[in-house]
Amino acid sequence: MEIPVDQTEREDITSEKMAQINPLPVHLGPWKITVYDQENFQGKRMEFTSSCANIMECGFDNIRSLKVECGAWIGYEHTSFCGQQFVLERGEYPRWDAWSGSNAYHIERLMSFRPICSANHIESKLVIFEKENFIGRQRELCDDYPSLQAMGWGNNEVGSMKVQCGAWVCYQYPGYRGYQYILESDHHGGEYKHWREWGSHAQTFQIQSIRRIQQ
């Protein structure tokens, strides 16, 4: 004998079955960034909760200030996620030099951006290797290192890297200066076997400081 089920119970059962059939994606966010076409949060503004490959398609000629309200993001110098990379963590960036930090290079353009889905400041693990293709001396990192040489790495280059957990930003010089390279556990399978895979702007093996990206 079938036991009667009211409409509310039927909906609950259906929802539960659907959740089992279609599990939620691993990366749900939330992410939120607000960009402005003038410095100091003036001018035209637009909010985003997902990637933007070309800000010009939204009527902007450039991004000159921004606010990150949720999540961590990567900003790119050029459209289609190319050029120099800038890690954008929660906070306010009134001018281009706020996101380029102590970068030795004067770059005022920010034309595309996307969320960093794998950022996890608490659980982050990175293995660096002396040579490309994961060969040679290696070192496991689980913390922030303003100077790899002071940590005992011994030289100013890293040949290849494996991101086992989280997301990391590597810098060309000590003290988190110079070119930024964002490495993620959900890109390239977390494996970066050569500097050419660090980003379209990468030109050298030189990395001298590394830190975890905060979500």
Swiss-Prot record:
Domain of life (superkingdom): Eukaryota
InterPro entries: Beta/Gamma-Crystallin (IPR050252), Beta/gamma_crystallin (IPR001064), G_crystallin-like (IPR011024)
Record keywords: Eye lens protein, Repeat
Region: N-terminal arm, residue numbers: 1-30
One GO MF term attached to the UniProt entry: structural constituent of eye lens
Domain Beta/gamma crystallin 'Greek key': 31-70, 71-117, 124-165, 166-214
GO BP annotations listed: lens development in camera-type eye; visual perception
Connecting peptide: annotated span: 118-123
PROSITE patterns per the UniProt record, alphabetical: CRYSTALLIN_BETA_GAMMA (PS50915)
Pfam families, per database record: Crystall
Post-translational modification: The N-terminus is blocked.
PANTHER family: BETA-CRYSTALLIN A3, BETA/GAMMA CRYSTALLIN
Domain remark in the UniProt entry: Has a two-domain beta-structure, folded into four very similar Greek key motifs.
Known role: Crystallins are the dominant structural components of the vertebrate eye lens.
Family membership: Belongs to the beta/gamma-crystallin family.
Subunit structure: Homo/heterodimer, or complexes of higher-order. The structure of beta-crystallin oligomers seems to be stabilized through interactions between the N-terminal arms.
Protein name, entry field: Beta-crystallin A3-1
